[in-house]
Amino acid sequence: MAAEGPVAKRLISVILRYNYGMNPLGSLSSAKKRGHVSKIESLPGLSSRANLRRRTTRCRPERRRFYSGTVNRNARSAGAASRSTSSVKRPLESKKRNARPETEKWCASYSAGNRR
């Protein structure tokens, strides 16, 4: 598949956005944060661009604070995953208490009518 012209490039970007949730020719830094750079580099035609961006943006201390959100999110999801496996033996009440905050919020809003 030859990637010539804007149509093919657009198609590639659409496919990549669908697969990895990102725009490869736009923000490669966001892809790097999510750990998708290696996936992009495996594709022909985009590898040089990815490598170029990767070399120029080293881990500078002022950039590091942007990574904290993803780190926390990953930690939270990992904690929730480990908790859900360990709470199988416990009764339902503790499982409810261990629900993630987003789920809890949704449940609260959903069952507000049934509570009264």
UniProtKB/Swiss-Prot annotation:
Biased composition (Low complexity): 73-87
Bias kind Basic and acidic residues: ranges: 90-105
Stretch list, region Disordered: 64-116
Domain of life: Eukaryota
Misc: Partially overlaps YLR279W and YLR281C.
Name of this chain's protein: Putative uncharacterized protein YLR280C
Organism of provenance: Saccharomyces cerevisiae (strain ATCC 204508 / S288c) (Baker's yeast)
